[in-house]
């Protein structure tokens, strides 16, 4: 099943109503950029916000959501803007959205009921799609930062708090999309979870949720209003105090769960070991840089785990460099039998052939990627960032099959992080990072 060719009943009918373009996190867009033969132009807006993601509701109706990088000083808050997709001018803005003073990126989506939903910190908000006023506000049961917000086929919302190893079990919460009342009992997993959730809707209507834990990947079944752990699918990808770090989000593609570990890098640990999460008495400065050495010696790994047989688990180290680390998950492109992996701490982008059920490095590119990418299977283009030695964060376009660098575009940003790239549907890409939001268009 492919997100870009099947609409999901939980969302407003749009090509990109939610992060990664769909619940399976395949990050694949219809159309093509043809960046190699085009000329790129950039519009950038610089401000004091932590821009996380852009989503589309109606055609041309775009929203950007995020938080504030308020690691010290005045308290943080979440926010959503409706923007002009060409100029990036703000057409409407939400009020400051309470977040329990937790500093983390959160998420937004365009729901089938017409509302814009926003999760940030320990709060969930339902917003009017036109003026972004608050329609409903809900404090979530877990007083921690939350990441990942998905709509399920029945319209209900699901989210989770973020917990590292040794911080107890992560809480998954399911809510009514109108009232934001909690449905059933929140589910506390046997272990913490750092990465965002994914979900898979089968042709027969069965829907399951996938959660990357601190040691296992978990599949959650929906039984009425209740969330139930699937006892038959709990593959282990690491052990306690392992020489590899925790997994970020999973990508569900070709009946396989794709994941990269080594994600709870030093800065992530520091943010989530404070209460409220990400709040410090004095400015933390470079203590929150993702370029710091990894707190383990294991190299970056890519995992391939069958959705039908959890024992069919293949692992590869695409780079082999000690102390690997990332802040965003991989992507799999079934049309090319290729998974894309990277090592943000040490540098390096790799295409990994997934043909015949195996994993084999097909190509390497000497760049330093960190973001959630976008792929265009029709044209074979991968869009991701490269944080350069000069301290600029460029957007690059790469040939999925060969790893050839097709184009490089300066965004005007000097901060890279693990936020989301989004296809605009008109040979364009929206770029979100701390202090910068940009649109790159090819003609």
Give names to the regions the model predicted.
Residues 2-78, 99-106:
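Beta-strand-rich domains and repeat architectures in extracellular enzymes and scaffolds
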Residues 47-54, 67-69, 76-113, 121, ...:
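Blade-loop segments of beta-propeller domains
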Residues 64-77, 161-168, 261-297, 387-388:
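Short, conserved, GDST-rich strand-edge loop motifs in beta-rich repeat architectures
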Residues 325-350, 360-400:
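Loop/turn-rich, solvent-exposed surfaces of beta-rich toroidal or solenoidal domains
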Residues 39-46, 89-98, 133-139, 181-191, ...:
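A short beta-strand motif characteristic of beta-propeller blades
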Residues 48-56, 99-109, 142-153, 191-202, ...:
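Repeated scaffold domains used in trafficking and secretory/extracellular systems
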Residues 410-443:
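Blade-level signature of beta-propeller repeat domains, shared across WD40, Kelch, NHL, RCC1
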Residues 23-24, 68-74, 123-125, 163-167, ...:
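Short glycine/acidic-enriched loop and turn motifs that connect beta-strands
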């Amino acid at each position: 099943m492919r997100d870009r060719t099947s609409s999901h009943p939980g969302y407003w009918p749009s090509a990109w109503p939610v992060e990664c373009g769909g619940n399976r996190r395949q990050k694949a867009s219809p159309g093509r950029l043809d960046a190699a033969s085009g000329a790129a132009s950039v519009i950038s807006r610089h401000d004091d916000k932590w821009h996380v993601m852009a989503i589309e509701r109606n055609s041309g109706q775009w929203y950007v959501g995020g938080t504030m990088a308020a690691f010290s000083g005045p308290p943080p808050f979440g926010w959503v803007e409706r923007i002009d997709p060409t100029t990036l001018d703000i057409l409407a803005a939400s009020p400051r959205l309470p977040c329990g003073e937790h500093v983390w990126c959160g998420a937004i989506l365009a729901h089938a009921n017409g509302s814009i939903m926003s999760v940030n910190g320990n709060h969930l908000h339902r917003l009017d799609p036109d003026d972004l006023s608050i329609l409903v506000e809900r404090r979530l049961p877990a007083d921690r930062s939350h990441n990942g917000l998905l709509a399920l086929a029945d319209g209900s919302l699901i989210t989770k708090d973020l917990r590292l190893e040794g911080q107890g079990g992560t809480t998954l919460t399911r809510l009514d999309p109108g009232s934001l009342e909690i449905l059933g009992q929140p589910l506390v997993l046997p272990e913490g979870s750092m990465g965002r959730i994914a979900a898979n809707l089968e042709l027969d209507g069965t829907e399951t949720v996938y959660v990357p834990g601190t040691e296992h990947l978990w599949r959650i079944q929906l039984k009425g209003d209740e969330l139930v752990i699937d006892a038959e699918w709990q593959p282990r990808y690491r052990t306690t105090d392992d020489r590899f770090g925790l997994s970020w989000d999973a990508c569900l593609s070709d009946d396989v769960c794709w994941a990269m570990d080594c994600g709870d890098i030093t800065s992530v640990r520091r943010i989530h070991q404070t209460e409220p999460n990400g709040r410090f008495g004095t400015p933390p400065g470079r203590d929150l840089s993702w370029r710091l050495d990894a707190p383990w010696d294991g190299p970056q790994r890519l995992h391939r785990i069958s959705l039908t047989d959890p024992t069919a688990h293949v692992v590869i180290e695409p780079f082999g460099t000690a102390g690997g680390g990332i802040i965003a998950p991989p992507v799999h492109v079934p049309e090319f039998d290729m998974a894309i992996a990277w090592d943000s701490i040490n540098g390096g982008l790799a295409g990994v052939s997934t043909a015949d059920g195996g994993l084999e490095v097909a190509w390497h590119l000497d760049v330093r990627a960190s973001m959630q990418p976008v792929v265009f299977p029709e044209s074979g283009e991968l869009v991701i960032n490269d944080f350069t030695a000069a301290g600029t964060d460029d957007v690059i376009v790469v040939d999925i099959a060969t790893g050839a660098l097709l184009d490089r575009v300066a965004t005007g940003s000097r901060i890279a992080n693990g936020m989301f790239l989004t296809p605009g549907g008109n040979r364009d890409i929206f770029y979100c990072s701390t202090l910068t939001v940009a649109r790159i268009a090819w003609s």
